[in-house]
Amino acid sequence: MDVVTRFAPSPTGNLHIGGLRTAIFNFLYARRHGGKFLLRIEDTDLARSNTAYLESILQALKWLSLSYDELVYQSVNVNRHREVALELLNRGKAYHDNGAVRLKVNHDETVKFSDLILGEISADGDSINDVVILRSDGSPTYMLAVVVDDHDMGITHIIRGSDHITNTFAQKLIYEGMGWSLPDFAHIPLIHNTHGAKLSKRDGAVDVIDYRTAGILPEAMFNYLLRLGWSHGDKEIFSIQEAIDLFDITAVGKSPARFDREKLYSLNSYYISGLPLERIASEVRSLVEEKIIVSYSAFIAFVELFRKKCSSIVELKDNLQFCWCTDSCLEVDRLLLQEVLKLLENTDWGPSLQQILKEYISLSGFSAKEVYTNLRMALIGQEHSPSVVEIMQIFGKDVVLKKLRNSLK
């Protein structure tokens, strides 16, 4: 059997991290088994559907390199949905109710299905409603449309959140009512906050776009969501290809995973420090509208120097503002900087710059903290930074002297 999975978001809001994890699991399962991963936009709610939300979904998948094999819009299949509703009526599996059509449920029978993650799940028939499948205005409901589309698209494995379990019982009856083969189901436990409650906007950002805007790298987001409920031994870092090779849906945990922003940012820091320097520089540059006022080689060197202390691209960008901004409102010790300027003007510092500054500190009466802090403020407009000596060496003597003179004007 050729595996076919699908991710079926609705363009009625921005894609949230739970939805993105579902997309990742569907993508990996299909690729792991040499199958197809389809994207279905469930846009039948015309009043709430929005092209901006649709674009955010498409961009999020592109951002994480989750390539899909086919894009389907549910709204184009409305006539097919109605056709199936009428067929269920003809088969005695549905009935009219005040102009609408409802699924006929045998409330005396137990409905059960086997889940690839949670095992066998069952529900008493009297707990399953005779759900509306066709509204009185002739429009199909989600409950019907999703089954028809999954069948017609040849979906073999439905991987989705555990909040859909109650839907599955009624949907199973639609499959059986039409005489269709049932796909395999895998319901992923929901994502909770660190306190064990359902994740919500009160816990901070939950939309994918918010994390992208905050400077999370796609590699970090992919890797973090991948391991949010799934693991492979003690391995913590996965490339997409490694994840494809190792992913097993039956290894997904049965309990809700807890979303920890600190762990996500820690993982992001790992990628900021470890990905190719040119890539990180490009990520920073994409956030800056202003012209870089240092040389490109200096900019690259500053990215390398500062990236080790940053947990997001936005934080790194903020630390590098001196590369495109000349304004600084920090007060400096003019006497100290005048002395340092005079010293540096008359010294061939080269590789001995560290020693030159140490000797000055020992003779000047100023502390090392005072000297280095004032140099930082004059050179980059910050009180704290990596090695000020390295910063000076990257700028070069001419630029350092110019900046010191400007700070004394």
UniProtKB/Swiss-Prot annotation:
Keyword terms, alphabetized: Aminoacyl-tRNA synthetase, ATP-binding, Cytoplasm, Ligase, Nucleotide-binding, Protein biosynthesis
Motif 'HIGH' region mapped to chain: 9-19
EC annotation from Swiss-Prot or TrEMBL: 6.1.1.17
Record Pfam families: Anticodon_2 (PF19269), tRNA-synt_1c (PF00749)
Gene3D superfamilies linked: 1.10.10.350, HUPs
Protein's GO biological process: glutamyl-tRNA aminoacylation
Chief localisation class: cytoplasm
Coiled coil: none
Residues the record lists as binding ATP: K201
Subcellular locations according to the entry: Cytoplasm
Example GO molecular function: zinc ion binding
GO cellular component: cytosol
Motif 'KMSKS' region: chain residues: 198-202
Swiss-Prot/TrEMBL catalytic activity: tRNA(Glu) + L-glutamate + ATP = L-glutamyl-tRNA(Glu) + AMP + diphosphate
Catalytic class of the enzyme: ligase
Signal sequence region: none
Cross-referenced PANTHER family: GLUTAMATE--TRNA LIGASE, GLUTAMATE--TRNA LIGASE, MITOCHONDRIAL-RELATED
Family: Belongs to the class-I aminoacyl-tRNA synthetase family. Glutamate--tRNA ligase type 1 subfamily.
Subunit structure: Monomer.
Role, per record: Catalyzes the attachment of glutamate to tRNA(Glu) in a two-step reaction: glutamate is first activated by ATP to form Glu-AMP and then transferred to the acceptor end of tRNA(Glu).
Stated name of the protein: Glutamate--tRNA ligase 2
